[in-house]
Amino acid sequence: MHFVKKNSEEKRKDLNDKLKSNKILRVPGAYNPLTAKVIEEIGYEAVYVSGGVMANDLGYPDIGLTTLKDVSYRSNQIARVTNLPTIVDVDTGFKSCEETIKTFEKCGIAAVHIEDQIEQKRCGHLDNKELISKEKMVDKIKNV
């Protein structure tokens, strides 16, 4: 049995300290709790939950079909089994960035990144992506 010793706040502080160190962080992706535990045992600095991998694991293409519930549930499963900070790709913020951030804070997530694409985003590797304006993205960030 794997017992986590660090709470969410400690994990967030760890990530903040690591980012301030200006060192390159090795942050491999985990698609389930077992993968996260392996990442920790190998000695990486954090765990990353990819939106594309999450979509594919659920049987969807990476075009914005996952829900806040889908991603937060799996991310919580991953974060609770490791002492490492977990960073999650929250696509375009699932309609309400403020609600998304609150949800992921409750899930024990250390950080998220939010896409700057229009709704019904597309995988970053695909053509024909449309970005929102710089002003809208700044507003998105300010609102959270």
What are the roles of these predicted feature ranges?
Residues 47-70, 92-96, 114-135:
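Glycine-rich, proline-tolerant flexible connector loops at the mouths of alpha/beta enzymes
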